[in-house]
């Protein structure tokens, strides 16, 4: 059998590729422009490089028009994202992040859909000190954004403590071993002296001088929980457990959520399982998958540059064959597994190690003190006495983890004192909601998401309650643009911002994260959304089969067609 020759797409390099090529391994002129007192912003070329250091330049879009009228530059600020593999932070790290949010940020913390922290509202003059303070807690922001491997996720699963520990250690190893090797970050932010490279020095043996064509995301799931949406990842590992022992992983490749409105050549896609590997093989598999994307990904058209398009263009079997050739061994046959949900399980759970875990509901992932709900203060007080850890979940919630029996009562008292919610007073719909930041800080947002979804759910809850569905979990997700940070295409009800107050509405994703949704209504506002759900939810309440989820119902009832693959996502 003749091996298929793989090729990269032809075409001139994109502007970002040219910026990376000239950047001296992600240095650019960042060191100089961050010292420039004239503007609170930085040039676009340096902002493209800044992503690889874990940050984006943004501006407060609520103030944009007024500042234009006053002939002022935009209200520039930076978002800073922490690298936190597996989403686990110590109490000390939590307290430092809380302090930095108040000292340099906007007084809030954002828990992201990739299990890490974001600080918003940091001014240019405070960036270096903020990064140094983060570094002092043994954390960093390296490769939290950019054309590299991003934050590695793993299931926040307190039910299987031993397996979770093994998977978490693997997530950390993946994150560390796949880091860029350039010292640019350390020189710019931590004042490390630059060492001149010798001619035979290979600065980036894995990534190369151009890094990857686009971002790359890895996640590790522990069935039956698919809380990390493993099929949304460029590279996913599904833990296989036998006799309560981790024996290996199924390997899935080629997932991703982003697309571009109006361009059917872009689409969300689910990763496909290609085989099984042992725990010892995971890191090498990840490295070789990354090099395949490095060599064959699209460096000409960025909207088609994600690994999912590389896999679909080259063919799944051809990519698998190339991977096995680079590895020098064949993947074994995939093992059986079962997912039953992609949400979180709330409240207290006792792990098999005798430690306790309390999962809190954090709406929109925003840690803030509300007028009637001192959420941020309450968690801060717990962090002061907590000897365990904090686990940031992929659904933007928070687990107070590894609580000892003698500390549990003390923490329970603080939970009660500050009213820290496990979400049981809310509908299951609200507990199953997720939204990206969107306005006012995200430059890509076309509509609201985090600030609006809770208000929309207020009104949907009336329909839910009228139809006896308050305790029925229905995943609902909203993003301000089609990039998919809140994994909208895996929501049983999904909204993608189209313009202020207008959204594309999607239905029919699987409750366990194994099927994409389908476009149901285009460019609808709140009134149309409520009218549609006012018709659909009563039908679901009356016509559903036993234990049938909403996403399955709308497909079975013919309300939307089933999306069998990302390549037919746009087919109506």
Swiss-Prot record:
Keywords: 4Fe-4S, Amino-acid biosynthesis, Cysteine biosynthesis, Heme, Iron, Iron-sulfur, Metal-binding, NADP, Oxidoreductase. [4Fe-4S] cluster binds at residues 436, 442, 481, 485. It comes from the Bacteria. Its EC number is 1.8.1.2. InterPro entries: CysI (IPR011786), NiRdtase/SiRdtase_haem-b_fer (IPR005117), Nit/Sulf_reduc_fer-like_dom_sf (IPR036136), NO2/SO3_Rdtase_4Fe4S_dom (IPR006067), NO2/SO3_Rdtase_4Fe4S_prot (IPR045169), NO2/SO3_Rdtase_4Fe4S_sf (IPR045854), NO2/SO3_Rdtase_FeS/sirohaem_BS (IPR006066). Its cofactor is siroheme; [4Fe-4S] cluster. It catalyses: hydrogen sulfide + 3 NADP(+) + 3 H2O = sulfite + 3 NADPH + 4 H(+). Siroheme binds at residue 485. Pfam families: NIR_SIR, NIR_SIR_ferr. One of its GO terms (molecular function) is sulfite reductase (ferredoxin) activity. GO terms for cellular component: sulfite reductase complex (NADPH). SUPFAM superfamilies: Nitrite and sulphite reductase 4Fe-4S domain-like, Nitrite/Sulfite reductase N-terminal domain-like. Binds 1 siroheme per subunit. Binds 1 [4Fe-4S] cluster per subunit. The keyword Transmembrane does not apply. Component of the sulfite reductase complex that catalyzes the 6-electron reduction of sulfite to sulfide. This is one of several activities required for the biosynthesis of L-cysteine from sulfate. PANTHER family: SULFITE REDUCTASE [NADPH] SUBUNIT BETA (PTHR11493:SF47), SULFITE REDUCTASE [NADPH] SUBUNIT BETA-RELATED (PTHR11493). Alpha(8)-beta(8). The alpha component is a flavoprotein, the beta component is a hemoprotein. This is Sulfite reductase [NADPH] hemoprotein beta-component. It comes from Bacillus pumilus (strain SAFR-032).
